[in-house]
Amino acid sequence: MYEPGTEQINCNGRLIELPTLEVVRPAPKMPSDANIDWLLHIYFTRREFTRCRRLIERELNRHLNPEYLYFVQGLIDREEGNHIEALRHLQKSAELNPRNIETYKEIGRTLYIMGRFSQALGVFREAEQRSSRQDHEIYHYLGELLYRAATTQSQKDVASQQQDEARTYFELAVQSGRKLESYVRLAELYRKDKQYQKAIEILENCLHLTPENSEVLIEISVLYLKINETQKAHDRLAEVVSIERKCSPKGLLAFGAILQSRNDIDGALSKYSQIANAEPEIAELWNNIGLCFFKKQKFIVAISSLRKSVWLSPLNYNALYNLSLIYIASEQYASAFHTLAAAINLRKDNAECYMLLGLCLRKLDDMENAFVALERASSMATGQQGAGRNPLVVLNFALFCYETGRLALSTEQYNRFMSQAQDLLLPTEYKFQATKLKSLLRISNQGNGILLDSADMGESDLGHNRATELLPDELPLEVNAVVSQN
């Protein structure tokens, strides 16, 4: 019978001694030339840098090929912020094995962190030449460095060429790998070129990688607002709310823009108030708040909000344009003149700014300069094609010419307006003004040329505050004011 805790067993009256089983494994002895790269890799992935350093110091002098030792030493130095030593060790590793592409990539990353972008670009180009396969990391960094170089380039042609090359590399990065940053950067470049549909497609594909990425969903909703797809934008923002229960300021701003575009001013202001409590230093926020109060005919509060927007972002064209509209609506023509001058300095090719400038000068009794401004606006509007054309600019010039006695020129501009507006659906108020001008020109009986019929055309108005109803891409309205951040 066996008794627990004893080393004997009673079997048929006899005591039998139990043998003691004891397995002793001696510690393995590594030969001096054994490869311990695997152990070093384990320590590094565990971030046990002290053990890594001791192991590297012990093995560096007796290792037959210290390439990996120098490589890991460089990575450790970079993690600890010692970039010069990291670069030195990585270069030693590259000298021992010039065919190792990973070493070149780490050298390029180190130079990128150090801010030596031109040198990093050269290293990644060399890595691209040495690589025998498509490497999405190399393509991504090449695109990133070229895009950075394009933003700091003073020569426009060179900057455009670098930006196109950066887009090509980001496209290669997206095709050869699944890196979130590459998708985001490529979409950013498409957005900068106003190719909003392509940017949306890229970000929709990005959602396959991270279906619940709220930042990507918000960016998609903003792009949908760019193309006036407010319902799709709302659906994407609803997904963000269902994921996070709370929207970021950018998402709330887009939510408010959607409500504002649907004339739900109080709902939009409630969204904006949430942003103002958390992050009040957002120029687009105060721009949109100003437009909400403008819709409520509260001019003083609207002007204060838009002036704060301009103060936060002095080069924000939309805020300057909107502020000038409110100044004109409140009959502050001198202030509107100065604000429009600042907006024109930012966009010298915008016909609507020159049109409003001409209206301000007319109200200030400077007829000569008003004629020059309106003439320039008309010539710009005539040269625009497609969705960019604004026949209201031409009609305003025609009305001004009639007012100042230039009947022949007024007739010419009226006919030009008719040819531009014949396939557009314009507000009824504009049609009334155009019909009135046509009647006045016929009564005067001095118009040179035949007046076109206005039976089937859209309309126009000298009313400056109606100019924003024509061009959805250029309007300083709520949606565009939000999504115009570049």
From Swiss-Prot:
List, alphabetically, the SMART domains matched. TPR
Q: Which domain of life is it from?
A: Eukaryota
Q: Name one GO cellular component term.
A: pericentriolar material
- Could you tell me the keywords of this UniProt record? Cell membrane, Cell projection, Cilium, Cytoplasm, Cytoskeleton, Membrane, Repeat, TPR repeat
Question: Molecular function terms in GO for this entry?
Answer: dynactin binding; protein-macromolecule adaptor activity
Matching entries from PANTHER family are given as: BARDET-BIEDL SYNDROME 4 PROTEIN (PTHR44186:SF1), PTHR44186
Q: What is this protein called?
A: BBSome complex member BBS4 homolog
Question: Which organism's genome codes for this protein?
Answer: Drosophila melanogaster
